[in-house]
Amino acid sequence: MKGTSEVKPMETHRKLLKPLVEKRRRERINNSLEKLRIFLFQTLKSEKLKNPKVEKAEILECTVQFLQSRKLLPLDREAVDKEYQSGFQHCLETTLHFMNSKPDMNGVTKELLSHQMSSCKSPSDAWSPNCAPLTKHVPSLSYQDSAPHLVSNSISISPTKTLVDSHFTYQSFKTWRPWV
């Protein structure tokens, strides 16, 4: 008998929570649909999406049509490459700035960062998803390394120069991967 009396409050609690949970779920769905309607209206300039009371099915149909049309558009490879190069360039400049700001950085860390940067190709090489070509000169980086025979003392990145001295190449090493 005691077991059934303990179950009753739990069932009552669940019954009270169920409408609240359902209400929150519906609010989330409606908020997301409204954001989607606004996005589609701004993107497609469709008059039927102008009305905030448009049916949910209409919003979903417009979304499907929009996604299908985006899939059929030809990919502007040049624009994608340019955007990738821009992002890569920004990351490279940030890395160089970080390395310049840390004179006490571990030599191994500098060696690994320099190795990663040295694998970059020049603009005349083909585009690579691993490393985009550099399109502009990056400020030079100078530091004294604890392993001067591995990395040059002065590193300058430009489209015509490499990152390491000609007396040493990293071809004898495997490519370093942080997850291996």
UniProtKB/Swiss-Prot annotation:
PROSITE patterns noted in UniProt: BHLH (PS50888), ORANGE (PS51054)
SMART domains tied to this protein: HLH
Any Gene Ontology biological process: regulation of neurogenesis
Annotated ranges, domain bHLH: 13-70
One of the record's GO cellular component terms: nucleus
Residue interval(s) of motif WRPW motif: 176-179
UniProt cross-references to Gene3D superfamilies, sorted A to Z: Helix-loop-helix DNA-binding domain (4.10.280.10)
InterPro entries: bHLH_dom, HES-7_bHLH-O, HES_HEY, HLH_DNA-bd_sf, Orange_dom
Induction text: Not induced by Notch-signaling.
Main location: nucleus
Function: Transcriptional repressor. Represses transcription from both N box- and E box-containing promoters. Demarcates the prospective midbrain-hindbrain boundary (MHB) region in the neuroectoderm in early gastrulae embryos by repressing transcription of a number of target genes.
Subunit note: Transcription repression requires formation of a complex with a corepressor protein of the Groucho/TLE family.
Record comment regarding domains: Has a particular type of basic domain which includes a helix-interrupting proline. The C-terminal WRPW motif is a transcriptional repression motif which is necessary for interaction with Groucho/TLE family members, transcriptional corepressors recruited to specific target DNA by Hairy-related proteins.
Protein name: Transcription factor HES-7.1-A
Organism: Xenopus laevis
